[in-house]
């Protein structure tokens, strides 16, 4: 059976049963049907004691797929089986990848969160609420221009964009306000995909409703004609925007195929945002379980770095262990093997491609957190390839655990779970910080480029230098850095596989995200509104007369 067939044939427990198992009072459980619920954490008396936190990351993604979410879910099931108290905290899927190329984000095989089709399609409406809130703010800005422009906003400086939760390249560059003086002030604008909206980052970093509203009010929307910054608070609409997110801020509860409680909430991409699920979701799981397994988007150079340098300080809890997911076939691809040949034994390509995993291992060890590698097993992997990879990893002084979560779920992940339990009990002391937030913007960027990516230097466009000067002048240079970079390579060139070194990173622009609390550094050709591929996944999705969905993955 494929993923959706496995999901549809699963025996799900009522969500109230899952909530009780997780220790939630029935009064805070707000069901969305039989198998989904919102958790009203603001009505819950919080447990101040936090469990162990396990961060799952991976090597750079390849067309072959790494199975990071699959390993995350399988590990969560195995930990729950072994300890009786584990939860999973994941991001919500975006409709863009579901209908585009990447597919959903619920794991695979017998290591899935369910109901898979509901989660991948609309879920509890969080993405729509974020889209509505984002576009309401955009409409209010343009209405302010139309109604006399009391704040003297320079339309050419407006940085707040409209958004849509679908890949639509035709909306990357648009002109609005056409049709005469009753149709608004004409100006150029752009659409982003919803998960790239600053509101998504804010939702995922907010500690509560008060913090949410304060962060929204801090959003920089434009400059006035005197060059002074204009914020949402100047429009007096922060409360209205926060109101539209009053339900979206509540974490969502579902279950795995193994009936492990899973909280799915928030979904920023790691290549254009910080790539982590919400602080509220992670903290809720930590308060209710001995072990919380969470993941960060794309490879460790993006998602894990941002988890550790952006999310962890807000969360107030560092990971107790890090799992790096790798596959034999993805490393062979990094070693020069062709996509069509990845099922053929090629130890030489594996050894060449290992440098990609090796750099990720060294990067994670830099933070002084225990690390292990999960070798996500595929049927095409040969014994010689697996044994070779295990020896290479163990030469780094860490463990390598072969995992078969797709085919066996939690049962195929118990060795990994036992290793994680042992690592999480190791007292390593405080996490080592990568950089000092109070350092110069250029120094922080260069530190990431040199220490994490393996580059040698950074080149800035005139626009990027202008933004740095603006940040310094306004006292915004103390914010952490959120790199927007290709997920396929350590460099800003997606074709440079393996572990490129001594390259120059090209910074095109810097987006100032005061509400989220970081600076987005735009590199290479990263797009905040993706396009659909020649054969989008939507072509294979269908529904029959009984409401059964096919083609989701």
Swiss-Prot record:
Catalytic activity, as annotated: (6S)-5,6,7,8-tetrahydrofolate + formate + ATP = (6R)-10-formyltetrahydrofolate + ADP + phosphate
GO molecular-function term, one example from the UniProt record: ATP binding
Listed EC numbers: 6.3.4.3
Domain of life, source organism: Bacteria
Binding residues for ATP: 62-69
Alphabetical list of Gene3D superfamilies matching this protein: Domain 2, N(10)-formyltetrahydrofolate synthetase (3.30.1510.10), Formyltetrahydrofolate synthetase, domain 3 (3.10.410.10), P-loop containing nucleotide triphosphate hydrolases (3.40.50.300)
Protein's UniProt name: Formate--tetrahydrofolate ligase
Provenance organism: Pediococcus pentosaceus (strain ATCC 25745 / CCUG 21536 / LMG 10740 / 183-1w)
Gene encoding the protein: fhs
